[in-house]
Every structure is written in C-alpha cells, then in structure tokens.
Amino acid sequence: MAKRIFDTSYLIGHWRIFPKATKRTTDNMRAWSEKLIDQYGTRQIVTPVYIEMVAGVTSSDELKLTRAYLDPFEIIDEGKIPKRDWDEAKVMSQRVAPKGGKRQLGDCLVRAIAKRFNCEVLTSDKGFPAR
C-alpha cells in the first residue's frame, strides 16, 4: 500500500466539522487533528498544504488554532521543493481534463511532491490532478 498524504481540502473539511459544542482551543484543535491522523493512519502533509492552511486564516486567534491543528502533522518534504517537482507540476498544469476545468498551482505542486515520495493524496477536491 502506498504511503498517503493529506491535501488541504481534507484538512479544511475536517476542520469544519469540529464539534460545535466544544470550544476551539489550541489543545482541542491539536487533539482534533490527531483524530484524523488516527483515522487514516498517516500524519504526512507537504509544504504547500501547510502554507495553504496558514494562508487561509483571517485573525491572529485563528492562526494560533491553525498552527496547533497542524502541529501533529509531519511535512515530508521538509520545505525542500526541487526543480523536478516544479517541472512535474508544470506538466500537470498543462493537462486539460476531458470535461475541462482549471488546474490550481497548489494542487499540481502537491501532486508532484506526492509523486516524488510515492504517496497517494487524500483529497476531497474533484478537480485534483490525476497522477
């Protein structure tokens, strides 16, 4: 079985279903992400996923919660994205799906990095580029 990494769409979807009756604290958000990790048996993400999550916050409080949520994850590329990943993302960006639709820079780069690490990408994004 291939290793698996989470895409931003999976993390955002999980973030949004945090129980409404529970207060969002750094400890609770960290524990919440650990539940996702336990459920899927992986804690791996890539740098673009981390950046997309952090870039989506709208306040300093939300930033603290997001960082706590992301703490348990392992960034497998360690922030090192070589030229070959960019080249692969470029190739993916030029693939037009039969039904059309736009490709996103982040999605293409996530897929390229995942390919380098021989990982399956867990995503809920229907337009995510195929291998």
PLM ranges: what are they?
Residues 30, 50, 63, 86-89:
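A general structural signal for well-ordered alpha-helical segments in protein cores
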Residues 8, 47, 104-108:
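Conserved glycosyltransferase catalytic-site signature
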Residues 1-45, 55-68:
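Short, well-structured N-terminal submotif of metal-dependent ribonuclease cores
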Residues 105, 129-131:
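Short secondary-structure capping/turn micro-motifs that flank functional sites
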